[in-house]
Swiss-Prot record:
UDP-N-acetyl-alpha-D-glucosamine binds at R93, D307, I329. The modification 2-(S-cysteinyl)pyruvic acid O-phosphothioketal is found at C117. The active site is at C117. This is UDP-N-acetylglucosamine 1-carboxyvinyltransferase.
Length: 419
């Protein structure tokens, strides 16, 4: 099993190209199920979860392949079964996103209950309740969701009890081929939702007001394939910016989307960084500026993203003062804290908050990644820890970061992938 061996880094310097967003690419790949003809997707990152998605689409019968580095081609016309098996779905929570498209296009779907990161209860009931409002008959038995509909799904007014990115995506896709108008209230507002809506519209869908909490979808009879480029990954961008900040460096993130990172950039400025942005780039300069701890409260977009919480815990560990990081989205999302404590971090856990008391230095240690973003926080800590840090179970990292050690080494880090 691969590990990362990290040695203390000089201040990171230089420029790094940001990959396409995993959290946008996954639903966009699944949306191809809705089309009658071939879809061509660009800026698709090379990640384990993307490979799992392509394998899942192939299992359904689609011709799904990566044709070059970041280009993916999917011909859905050969789909001949509606069964998403446990073997693939167990490794990736986003597999649930085949449910809505299969049901809308083919009238049935049998999807194993999903896996993914073990960061608390993330129930699929909102997905199922919404599809039932659109006329689906759904049973959950033997670990599978079995859904059917007679004829087309019907447009409906759907109010979601809580904000859910996955449910918003699944229902938005299903509604594109429904009969009539669907209104999603209390919808998620993340940039990845907007990106999916733009892709669906490029296929011929009629989705409006994505990015607001009330999305309208006028169903159409057919969708066609399209060419679409996935938006840049705001979480990868934020992770590199924090890595530069904790090392006292200066970096430029190219192929970025600054408008998707307002909450993160604001906190980095509060931490002492000088931030400059352009249309598709972000520059952070921490040279000569003391790193100051910040308070964070995660919230649905446009609030502070939960996927950046662990990285800011790592920042607070080596910043001046005390910073409180409060997790309001998921329970059980502080599994990185005991690992950071092994490196000498002073963190007190209080219910859903991590109280981080900055220390002058961390010490290298053997640590274990527990989920995707937690693993990123350990890499960040390793960059500034004295001695060597070994991060185990980095398959979590490979699910969401494209060639992270290569990119960081290009900025001056010293990281090796070892067995």
């Amino acid at each position: 099993m691969d590990k990362l061996l990290i040695k203390a880094s000089k201040p990171l310097q230089g420029s790094v190209r940001i990959s396409g967003a995993k959290n946008a690419a996954l639903p966009i790949l699944m949306s191809s199920i809705l089309a009658d003809t071939t879809c061509y997707f660009d800026n698709v990152p090379e990640l384990r979860d993307i490979n799992t998605s392509l394998a899942l689409l192939a299992e359904l019968g689609a011709d799904a392949k990566r044709v070059s580095g970041h280009a993916v081609e999917i011909d859905p016309s050969s789909i001949n079964n509606c069964n998403a098996s446990y073997d693939l779905v167990k490794t990736m929570r986003a597999s649930i996103l085949v449910l809505g498209p299969l049901l809308a296009k083919y009238g049935e779907a049998n999807v194993s209950l999903p896996g993914g990161c073990a960061i608390g209860a993330r129930p699929v009931n909102l997905h199922l309740q919404g599809l039932e409002k659109m006329g689906a008959k759904i049973d959950v038995e033997a670990g599978y969701i079995r859904a059917k509909v007679d004829g087309r799904l019907k447009g409906a007014n759907i109010f979601m009890d809580m904000v859910s990115v996955g449910a918003t995506e699944n229902l938005m896709m299903a509604a594109c081929l429904a009969d009539g108008e669907t209104v999603l209230e209390n919808a998620a507002r993340e940039p990845e939702i907007v990106d999916l809506a733009n892709c669906l519209n490029a296929m011929g869908a009629k989705v409006t007001h994505a990015g607001s909490d009330k999305i309208r979808i006028q169903g159409v009879e057919r969708l066609q394939g399209c060419r679409y480029a996935v938006l840049p990954d705001r979480i990868e961008t934020g992770t590199f910016l924090i890595a530069a900040a904790v090392t006292g460096g200066k970096i430029r993130c190219e192929n970025a989307a600054p408008e998707t990172l307002d909450a993160v950039l604001d906190k980095l400025v509060m931490a002492g960084a000088v931030i400059t942005t352009g249309d598709d780039w972000i520059e952070l300069d921490m040279q000569g500026h003391p790193l100051t701890s910040v308070n964070i409260k995660t919230a649905p977009h446009p609030g502070f993203p939960t996927d950046m919480q662990a990285q800011f815990v790592a920042l607070n560990c080596v910043a001046q003062g005390t910073g409180v990081v409060t997790e309001n989205i998921f329970e059980n999302r502080f599994m990185h804290v005991p690992e950071l404590q092994r490196m000498g971090a002073k963190i007190d856990l209080e219910t859903n908050s991590a109280v981080c008391h900055g220390v002058s230095s961390l010490k290298g240690a053997q640590v274990m990644a527990t989920d995707l973003r937690a693993s990123a926080s350990l890499v960040i800590a390793g960059l500034v820890a004295e001695g060597e840090t070994v991060v185990d179970r980095i398959y979590h990292l490979d699910r969401g970061y494209e060639h992270i050690e290569t990119k960081l080494n290009g900025l001056g880090a010293n990281i090796q992938r070892i067995k």
